[in-house]
Amino acid sequence: MKRNLPISFLFLVTMFIVMRWQGTGLITPQSPKGVLDLEFAKTPERFHQLQLFWNHKKVLQNIYLDFLFIVAYTWFLITACKAADNTKSNLFSGFAISAGAFNVLENFLMILVWNGRFEPSLLQIVYYASAIKFLLAGIVVGYLILSLFGLFKRESSH
């Protein structure tokens, strides 16, 4: 397990760099946050504004690459939770898996919306799936930071 932590971290950093590099074309004056602007585009008007300025193919490439990023951050967060080796590790590993699952849902819905299978209600679901994903991932990161300071009981030795 300890060997997986640096490997999963390297995979995470690699995917983060790839996503930033590939997503630079999505950063415009109308979308300073790149693909995050699509994730949080609650209204059809905002969605259509993004469509005007973005390359259709680059958006889809970014979303498809995000599936690898999901694997990377979920693997890293689970591995880090297990490395924390305390009584809450399994709970927070579950939160990491849930964050990844919400991200997968969000990506599938964004693909549907971006490809013209558009229902305004889908934007609301994408918005909330994205918000829940970030909340869960933030909770896990917070847990990991607190674990570094020993604020959770260690697992008893078997």
Predicted regions: what they are:
Residues 104-152:
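Alpha-helical transmembrane segments of multi-pass integral membrane proteins
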